[in-house]
């Protein structure tokens, strides 16, 4: 199976090569590996990963989804499932970051939970809400105190748009700190959202203008495929600073179709576990 060619791609890329590329891209984005470090090696996962088949999942979430219990919403159970699927490293946000106003406590709990579980598998990505007072201080705390490699943003739950000055300021600070910015376009299919928790897709169009004047900032779009048109995907891919996860891609040829629009070195594995089944994302690589 490792050498099976993903059908429909414009260039011949084996599953093994694609997994290597997405894993190395994730590691390089996190600053742990130079983009070309895997050339001539068998590295398939996180920096220092031994053996084949290891993966980096850039999209998992800890704690409780507000509307219902999810399978694997206990951190220890999620870690066990990640390991069983060959995941060597997982970038973790917190469901608490959606609605809690005490974001500092949310991030402190997230950092501690990642330290206590997984023996280094979990990398915390803190929540930052630029609508709240002192958000700049919390952003710096994620970087300086918690030593997080990045942050995860939920504009649709926090009530701001990407063309507002606060978001531009957030990008500038994140760039200065060398932080990855994960932008969640949607958390849940709009058809199944709780009536009192309607959250529209984030409009990511403003990224085109924002990134035109901001180089060296790392953006990862999560759960984006239902909220971003094909035409906009091509424009975003042309920017060169944006990476795309595969969590919400649908259909047998979802990954192959994406690779017709986006270079393989900017596509990363993301499962949206435990909200989605981890196995679904892994199967998308086959």
Feature annotation, model-predicted:
Residues 1-13:
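N-terminal secretory signal peptides
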Residues 14-35:
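N-terminal export leaders
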Residues 33-68:
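C-terminal segment of N-terminal export signals and the immediately downstream linker at the start
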Residues 56-58, 91-94, 125-126, 152, ...:
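Active-site neighborhood of phospho(di)ester-bond hydrolases with catalytic His/Asp-centered motifs
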Residues 63-65, 97-100, 130-134, 158, ...:
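Active-site environment of divalent metal-dependent phosphoester hydrolases
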Residues 88-89, 97, 101-189:
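Active-site gating/metal-coordination segments in enzymes
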Residues 149-150, 163-268:
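Catalytic pocket-lining loop regions of alpha/beta-barrel enzymes
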Residues 268-286:
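His/Asp/Glu-enriched, well-ordered alpha-helical/loop segment
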């Amino acid at each position: 199976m490792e050498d099976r060619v993903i059908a429909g791609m414009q260039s011949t890329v084996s599953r093994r090569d694609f997994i290597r590329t997405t894993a190395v891209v994730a590691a390089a984005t996190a600053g742990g590996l130079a983009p070309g470090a895997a050339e001539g090696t068998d590295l398939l996962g996180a920096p220092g990963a031994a053996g084949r088949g290891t993966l980096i999942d850039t999209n998992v979430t800890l704690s409780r989804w507000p509307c219902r219990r999810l399978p694997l919403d206990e951190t220890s159970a999620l870690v066990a499932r990640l390991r069983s699927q060959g995941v060597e490293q997982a970038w973790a946000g917190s469901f608490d970051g959606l609605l809690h106003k005490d974001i500092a406590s949310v991030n402190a709990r997230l950092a501690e939970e990642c330290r206590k579980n997984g023996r280094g598998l979990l990398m915390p990505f803190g929540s930052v809400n630029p609508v709240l007072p002192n958000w700049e201080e919390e952003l710096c705390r994620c970087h300086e105190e918690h030593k997080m490699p990045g942050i995860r943003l939920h504009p649709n739950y926090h009530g701001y748009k990407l063309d507002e000055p606060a978001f531009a300021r957030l990008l500038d600070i994140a760039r200065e700190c060398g932080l990855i910015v994960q932008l969640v376009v949607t958390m849940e299919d709009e058809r199944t959202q709780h009536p009192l928790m309607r959250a529209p897709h984030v409009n990511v169009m403003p990224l085109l203008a924002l990134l035109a004047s901001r180089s060296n900032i790392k953006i990862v779009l999560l759960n984006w495929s239902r909220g971003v048109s094909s035409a906009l995907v091509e424009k975003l891919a042309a920017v060169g600073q944006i990476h795309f996860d595969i969590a919400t891609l649908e259909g047998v040829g979802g990954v192959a179709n994406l690779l017709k629009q986006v270079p393989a070195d900017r596509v990363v594995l993301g499962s949206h576990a435990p909200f989605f089944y981890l196995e679904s994302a892994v199967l998308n690589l086959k």
